């Protein structure tokens, strides 16, 4: 099928998730003059922080530049991870063995924390503990998964196991991979429904949420901070910046430490039920070991493939990226070559130079960011931990708090180097697959 023919008649440049939970435009409350805590960013992290602060009686104002539900928290793939993407050896080299162990152990707690939050707040978002299949793009990648299995089991207590190529079709109906790994500690949800449910819980708890209220500047003053917004000036005792892949000039120090990267997703037209069940028979979340990775799943109702990946390292619209994603999907399942696309969308994720999420304080301003494209559970958890810290309720320091946070000389937050790095990664992935053919 030619790239021009992949679009279904009802194609939309919008997330599939918005069919069930479009961004809502709530009445914008009058901004309080002096909230105890002002939170910039109403994604998972900011809302989670607001909810926990209200549980401890702290007055909270959450502001966001866009409509609530219009950014990454409702644009992702709805995959819920319970581990970091970096192994213990790399973490130990950067932070020492003890801190490396603490980071991996605490990252595993993110999944349980999210599950408890969903139950406590009665958030209905099609959550399931599905497990995750990681497909090896070449034999050496499969061999490398063995150490990941051992690390996951030893340090997190979660189950994980290798799947040899001869048994691969028990997990995914393709010969595209050279075996893989299943990690039990992983789940799936509807990200827009989760975000809406979290925002509703925050409002019920008594926090003020003001959308379409961008913050132009944060200035330190005696006893707190002044925030200059599009709707007036607000003074707060504490400030949290929770803008992740959309961090701008409001906090230049943080922006210099984050690498925003566009991630793209397509949704197919509905498939015959028996076809969808055969493609991913156990309903796992699927990712691969490519440097330019793909991630995909079935929709919550089991009727469509939602296929995501790094389709472009340059600025591209979702419509422009859709043909590449479609081709990537067909490389896994050639039978879907004539399956059309009904939705395509994109949103920013944020990476860091050390491949680790961070929370901390700079010049008095709290921040949490850099979830490496796996922020559904991690961003929620870091928001919670930041709130505990502000409220003085932390039982123990969070392992992700106050880590050295690197940047690079002359880097200002515009990742000009991504097209070059992306092309290099694509070439290496291609060569490894070619040699394995």
Whereabouts are the PLM-identified features?
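Extreme N-terminal leader/targeting segments of oxidoreductases
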Residues: 1-37
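N-terminal Rossmann-like FAD-binding beta1-loop-alpha1 element of flavoenzymes
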Residues: 35-62
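Glycine-rich FAD pyrophosphate-binding loop
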Residues: 55-75
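Short beta-strand to alpha-helix junction loop
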Residues: 104-111, 135-144, 181-200, 210, ...
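Active-site substrate-recognition segment that forms the wall
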Residues: 112, 120-128, 215-217, 233-363
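Helical element adjacent to the flavin cofactor pocket in flavoenzyme catalytic cores
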Residues: 151, 175-237
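C-terminal catalytic lobe of FAD-dependent flavoproteins
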Residues: 315-317, 322-431
């Amino acid at each position: 099928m030619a790239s021009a023919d992949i679009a279904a008649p009802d194609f939309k440049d919008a997330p599939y998730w918005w069919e069930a939970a479009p961004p809502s435009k709530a009445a914008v409350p009058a901004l309080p003059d002096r909230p105890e805590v002002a939170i910039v960013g109403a994604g998972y992290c900011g809302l989670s922080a607001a909810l926990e602060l209200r549980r401890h009686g702290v007055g909270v104002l959450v502001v966001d530049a866009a409509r609530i539900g219009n950014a990454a928290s409702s644009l992702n793939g709805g995959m819920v991870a319970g581990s970091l993407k970096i192994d213990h050896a790399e973490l130990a080299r950067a932070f020492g063995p003890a801190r490396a162990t603490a980071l991996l152990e605490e990252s595993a707690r993110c999944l349980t924390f999210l599950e408890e939050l969903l139950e406590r707040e009665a958030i209905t978002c099609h959550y399931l503990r599905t497990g995750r299949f990681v497909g090896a793009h070449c034999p050496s990648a499969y061999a490398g998964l063995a150490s990941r299995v051992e690390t996951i089991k030893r340090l997190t207590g979660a189950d994980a196991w290798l799947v040899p190529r001869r048994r691969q079709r028990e997990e995914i109906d393709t010969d595209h991979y050279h075996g893989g790994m299943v990690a039990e500690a992983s789940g799936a949800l509807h990200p827009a429904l989760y975000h809406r449910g979290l925002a509703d819980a925050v409002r019920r708890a008594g926090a003020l949420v003001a959308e379409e209220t961008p913050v132009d500047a944060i200035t330190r003053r005696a006893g707190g901070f002044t925030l200059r917004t599009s709707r007036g000036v607000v003074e707060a005792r504490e400030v949290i910046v929770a803008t992740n892949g959309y961090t701008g000039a409001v906090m230049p120090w943080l922006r210099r430490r984050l690498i925003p990267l566009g991630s793209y997703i397509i949704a197919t037209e509905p498939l015959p039920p028996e076809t969808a069940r055969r493609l991913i028979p156990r309903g796992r979340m699927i990712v691969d070991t490519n440097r330019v990775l793909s991630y995909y799943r079935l929709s919550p109702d089991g009727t469509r493939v939602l296929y995501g990946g790094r389709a472009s390292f340059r600025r591209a619209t979702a419509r422009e990226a859709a043909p590449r994603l479609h081709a990537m999907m067909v490389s896994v399942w050639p039978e879907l070559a004539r399956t059309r696309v009904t939705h395509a969308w994109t949103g920013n994720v944020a990476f860091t130079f050390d491949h680790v999420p961070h929370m901390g304080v700079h010049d008095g301003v709290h921040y949490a960011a850099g979830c490496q494209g796996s922020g559904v559970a991690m961003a929620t958890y870091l928001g919670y931990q930041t709130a505990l810290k502000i409220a003085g309720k932390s039982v123990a320091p969070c392992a992700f708090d106050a880590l050295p946070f690197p940047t690079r000389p002359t880097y200002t937050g515009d990742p000009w180097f991504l097209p070059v790095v992306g092309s290099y990664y694509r070439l290496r992935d291609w060569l490894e697959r070619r040699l394995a053919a």
